[in-house]
Amino acid sequence: SEMCIRDRYRFAKWGKIKIGQALQLKKIPQRVFSPYLNEIDEDEYLTILNNLLMTKRKSVHAENEFELTNKLVRFALSRGFEMKDIRHCITLSDENDNLE
């Protein structure tokens, strides 16, 4: 299950929540895969999420910043990322936009 977790977040770009749900569907007990989810490198995980959000931001059409943020949050949640990580990446992205 460790390799499955790595593949899902590196290649399929899934978040921890969606990976956990997929493993539970395969009847793998949470006590087996939970330690591996906790071992995911936080920096790499946030980089993947940030890249996903930047790519999605380019393709999303929104009338204002509020609508854009909502669409990005819904997209990231559907990929299984946690709200705290999504908010962190969106805040960083907004700060970078303001610097330019």
Locations of regions flagged by a protein language model:
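An alpha-helical, amphipathic repeat domain used for nucleic-acid recognition
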Residues: 1-100
